[in-house]
Amino acid sequence: MVTTQNTKARVTSVSHRRSQQDPESPVKKFFKLVLPSTMKDKMMKIPPRFVKLQGSKLSEVVTLETPAGFKRSIKLKRIGEEIWFHEGWSEFAEAHSIEEGHFLLFEYKENSSFRVIIFNVSACETKYPLDAVHIIDSDDDIIDITGKEFVGTQGTRKNNQSVNGGDTEHKSKKRSRDIELDKILHDLDVMNPMHVLKEEEEDKRVFRG
């Protein structure tokens, strides 16, 4: 019996020392239920426990990103020991049709960046909108068949060509390609056996004459 009690005491002592030595694992995820006050105040409070463990790592502006790649910068508001998603939050909520009763899961990805998964009142993950800014960026460097280079869907010319200048340069390149093609065809014609035979017959006639 004494041995058993001593063993329990040692286990308790080791467990106590381990809990004191091991730092508390930082919280990476938290969820928020959208309340009427959230919609009214146009900002969302970050849970106090997350603020206590990770708040010192957050910069003045954080990034929220959805699984669809939609990103927005949100400015934080600090009130005492509280931290709120503030400027930019209402626009993010509006873009994703976030309403009272929606459930949001936040995952901290370091560098003041959060991944946000949104569940609507059906308790299912919502359909995320595409990021218009991201779409425009992905359309950069589009080259049409006339050889003119544009940016995105706005038709802004990236190079320094004017309309006429671009056409002139395009025509110049076309002439260069035509000359190169003619040279290749000429070389092929010279290598043609019939062409070589004709040249030999011509040489014989000149020699006989």
From Swiss-Prot:
Record localization: Nucleus
Region (Disordered): 1-25, 154-176
Ranges annotated as biased composition (Polar residues): 1-14, 154-165
Gene3D superfamilies to which the protein is assigned, alphabetical: DNA-binding pseudobarrel domain
A molecular function GO annotation: DNA binding
Gene Ontology CC, one term: nucleus
Binding region for DNA: 29-122
Keywords: DNA-binding, Nucleus, Transcription, Transcription regulation
Primary location class: nucleus
InterPro entries listed in its UniProt record: B3_DNA-bd, DNA-bd_pseudobarrel_sf, Plant_B3_domain
Pfam families to which the protein is assigned, alphabetical: B3
PANTHER family reported in the protein's UniProt record: B3 DOMAIN-CONTAINING, B3 DOMAIN-CONTAINING TRANSCRIPTION FACTOR VRN1
The protein, known as: B3 domain-containing protein At3g18960
